[in-house]
Amino acid sequence: MKTILRFKWPISILVIIVIVLSLIFAPNLSQLAKEKGEIKPPDSTSSQKYEHMLKDVGANSNSIVAVIKMKEPLSEQGNDKVEHFIKEIKKIDGVNQVISPYTNKDTFKKVVSKDKKTIPVEMTTGDSVKVADKINKIDDHPGKVYLTNNDLVTHDINKATDKGLQKTEIVTVALILIILFVVFRSVVTPFIPLFIVGLSYLFSSAIIAFLVKYCDFPVSVYIQPFLVALLFGIGTDYCILLLNRYKEELAAHDDKTKAVYETFVSGGKTILICGSTIFVSFLVILFAQFDLFRSAVGIGVGVVCLLIIMYTLLPLIMVLLGEKIFWPSKKATSHKENRFWGKLGNLSSKHAFVVILVILAVFLPLIYFTPNKITYDNTNEISNHYGSVKALDIIKDKFELGEAFPVTIAIKDNDKLTTSKGLSDLETLTKSINKIDNVKGVNTITRPTGTPIKQLSATNQLNEIQQQLTKANKGLGQVNNGLGTMQQKVQPLTQSQVVQQQMQQASQNPQAGVQSITQQASQLSQGLQQAQQGNEQVIDGQKEIQSYLKGMSQDDSVNRSGMYISQDMLNNKDMKRSIDQYSANHGNVVLLNVELKQNPYSKSAFKTLNNIKNTVDNQKNGTVFKNSKIEYGGVTSQNADLDHTINTDMTKVIILMSLVTFLVLVVFKRSIIMPLYMMFSILITYYVSMGIANVLFDYSFGEKGVLLVAPFFSLVILFSLGIDYAIFLLNRFNEEVRTHDIHNALITAMKKMGTVIVTACIIIVGTIAALYTSGMLTLMQIATILILGLLIYNLFILPLFIPAVVSTLGKGNWWPLKGPKKQQHK
């Protein structure tokens, strides 16, 4: 610190130059967050492998639904505007496989709402946002059109984040100014923290942007709102701690430089411990798999930038302004003690066991009995003023969500799968999936509208064979008729009397005789012709029947699938259309859409997905799919992967964060016991606040639970803030214990730090509350959990539980060492 004070001007100028250059050349962090901050599971999960599988074969994995709201019911005979609109969509580059309600009658019944006023038009595409923009630019819409899919919802969330960030920044600055004016009663003081923290925010945003662009640093759309809330909150807390300490040191020293030095030697050490703990705590998040979680490391980067500016620019400001920092307050050099916290400390130390018992008796049941519901439905993230959410609300109202967001299955093989055998096995697999509980239906090549194609069923084809046999019988009848005619005409010629009579007539009338013989020959010829035609029909019928029966007998899968798919059927026009719709890569990839009876965002849908996976694994043996790669996509699959990833990451991060924080605190505190109860107090606070928040969201606000990312971010942020406040108090306790006994040192520390901690808590609660202005449900839920946690920690844990534990342990607080060395009071 002496070096910094000695070279304060060169160091400050250098820091300012670095900050200015970084701001000039830094990429746009908001834009980078939109481009690279997609919320998705790791690449190793099935839902991402599904995406990559389709991209590798040149197929589009994104499906957009255009929801058309009509004023008048749609007619089955057609609607010119709707048909024109669909034709215009088909012309757009990047749009494939548009499913029109007029494809056939079955499709019309399936996709059009019961009142026939709502039509979802589904299409596949590569770039959802670009395609959506082009669709919105089509001039003649048949009604109100809303477009939706995961990408479009995310795009709208990004837009909402940008708007919310601007509001959050304004509200945060206003709250800090108001609170600091009240606390310090000074015109100058409030602007010092704002300057330091504002500069830190800009500097850290620039550094993170560089890291994202050039080092593939993890980023998300939430990083900037969190940076605003936390840097302004934590930074202001640190400034308050240092400014309050500076008040004390100014009263004790006439020299401003000496006062600044003592401030940073004592208070600065506390800040350094807090900042280092936060940084390493956030650094371990890099070991998580989920990129959204890993983006929280940016907060650690922000804290480092904050410390750099606080240790370089703030000392210069303090030396330059001195007591004028607190102008016009006349009591600038007095520091008022918090008597209320002193009384709480006295109470908890005298009745330590009772205080600990009461707090645990209240908090542990709250943790155990309150619900812990996590929802993966991000459709409530923003309001339905955005088109993607409006479309989802219409789908929820008019249709089943399971139909709109099916589980998608992709089966890939080195060999062609769209063969007779392959499609028969596909139908067998489809039948098994269709029997699973909570599966509403399956769409694939053999059942494009959810029901098996009638012409493919073996029963239907046996009926065709019966018709062929009937045809053959008619042919045999023709043969019999022809032979009968020949016999009738030839038989008289075999009788001698008749022959003699005809010969006699011929001699008397030669011309008549010739005519009679000619007639006989003609009749004989016709009879032979009938016989020949009948015989050909019989032969053709026999060949056709033999071909069908031979094919069926050689296809082992007919009994399982109930289908026999001949080569002629594969060449059928309608069949080719179905193959094109549900296959890719020239038949090496086949697709299935599994519609669920459940909400695809629910956890119960995850169980159904697991049942589908188990069924497919069991049924693929003995089929052409036994060596195929099978991956699962769709909302349910993605959320199931997120669920597994989040649970794994939460466990991993809690262990690593606790371990690293413990080691850092052991080094600074020179104690094993003190870090343990510090971390325990924070974890119990987190779980209590989560329990209360779940009750609030479930019963009071009508939500279906806490959104998936809220628990994680609430944990890591509350952990960091709680550690800060505990360090504030216990560091001062370690100072005071050098000149007092444990009881008096504790009471003195609480009196000295009570106002600082309460003020810091009010400020951080205010900055976090500013997240409510963002309009984003995730940020509002995180804000609620954090505010609950901060209130619980600063009303019950820090002033009651921690002092009670400290008093109970006595000298054991510093085990295995003896604690700080005693020295005489100055």
Residue ranges and their predicted role:
Residues 1-33, 95, 126-373, 600, ...:
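Membrane-embedded transmembrane helical bundles of large multi-pass transporters/channels
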Residues 1-172, 183-188, 335-345, 350-650, ...:
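Feature of extramembrane
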